[in-house]
């Protein structure tokens, strides 16, 4: 007996059954990507959601339920405590002009070298302005400050030329270094490959070019100028006197002689 055609398996008055038979055939003929797109296509973020999502993570941690965040991917850092700081050079904006800058320009001085995610953002201008406003305090202890991001020098200059009341920097006293190739950020282990910018990394480099301190912040929280000053002062004290600084040490506070007998002098006073 001759086999009936597929579409002849039902009578004309069974249209619903005929459509059910056709559905698997249509799904088989559709490209796989088209079917997958029905399940995986993401809804575009609204303007309100965009305001809560910035630089690879939420600006406000409490808003985490609004938008999912991919895991960050960091490069292996060449920056190691007590070792020479990774060399860098590039174009910076200094006093409104483009100038070439390199790490060795600061040999003989301490250097606070910090990364921030992006120009024209939220927390970043508050940090740069805070460090810039207190530059003389750093210079009084033979220390300079340089800020760096993956933006171009042209974007840096545009940000500097934007008034502070509009989220700009205005006249700023510290150099803004451009890391457009991302190489400096990668060498220092702060570059987020999945986001195209950096974490808030801060590095204290001593007058011999040795890296003494590393701080890494996630994106929503800025850094403390007071704590950075304290750390520089503490490292400089130990360099000069050979004694070590206890927790919370500030200039004028007691230090510890680092040997079994010498330490007793400090702990006897403390207790």
From Swiss-Prot:
Keywords in alphabetical order, please. Antioxidant, Cytoplasm, Disulfide bond, Endoplasmic reticulum, Oxidoreductase, Peroxidase, Redox-active center, Signal
Pfam families the record matches = 1-cysPrx_C (PF10417), AhpC-TSA (PF00578)
Supply one GO BP term: cell redox homeostasis
Q: What are this entry's molecular-function GO terms?
A: identical protein binding; molecular adaptor activity; molecular sequestering activity; thioredoxin peroxidase activity
Q: Which reaction does it catalyse?
A: a hydroperoxide + [thioredoxin]-dithiol = an alcohol + [thioredoxin]-disulfide + H2O
Cell membrane in keyword set? no
Q: Which family does it belong to?
A: Belongs to the peroxiredoxin family. AhpC/Prx1 subfamily.
User: Where does the record place the Thioredoxin domain?
Assistant: 79-237
Please tell me whether the keyword Nucleotide-binding is annotated for this protein: no
Chief localisation class? cytoplasm
Q: Which gene encodes it?
A: PRDX4
> What does the UniProt record say this protein does?
Thiol-specific peroxidase that catalyzes the reduction of hydrogen peroxide and organic hydroperoxides to water and alcohols, respectively. Plays a role in cell protection against oxidative stress by detoxifying peroxides and as sensor of hydrogen peroxide-mediated signaling events. Regulates the activation of NF-kappa-B in the cytosol by a modulation of I-kappa-B-alpha phosphorylation.
Q: Which interval of the chain is the signal sequence?
A: 1-37
Q: What is its EC number?
A: 1.11.1.24
Quaternary structure note: Homodimer; disulfide-linked, upon oxidation. 5 homodimers assemble to form a ring-like decamer. Can form heterodimers with PRDX1.
Describe its PTM? The enzyme can be inactivated by further oxidation of the cysteine sulfenic acid (C(P)-SOH) to sulphinic acid (C(P)-SO2H) and sulphonic acid (C(P)-SO3H) instead of its condensation to a disulfide bond.
What broad class of enzyme is this?
A: oxidoreductase
The UniProt record's further free-text remark is:
The active site is a conserved redox-active cysteine residue, the peroxidatic cysteine (C(P)), which makes the nucleophilic attack on the peroxide substrate. The peroxide oxidizes the C(P)-SH to cysteine sulfenic acid (C(P)-SOH), which then reacts with another cysteine residue, the resolving cysteine (C(R)), to form a disulfide bridge. The disulfide is subsequently reduced by an appropriate electron donor to complete the catalytic cycle. In this typical 2-Cys peroxiredoxin, C(R) is provided by the other dimeric subunit to form an intersubunit disulfide.
Q: Name the catalytic site residues.
A: 124 (cysteine sulfenic acid (-soh) intermediate)
A GO CC annotation recorded here is: endoplasmic reticulum
Name of the protein in question: Peroxiredoxin-4
Spell out the subcellular localization from the entry.
Answer: Cytoplasm; Endoplasmic reticulum
Matching Gene3D superfamilies: Glutaredoxin (3.40.30.10)
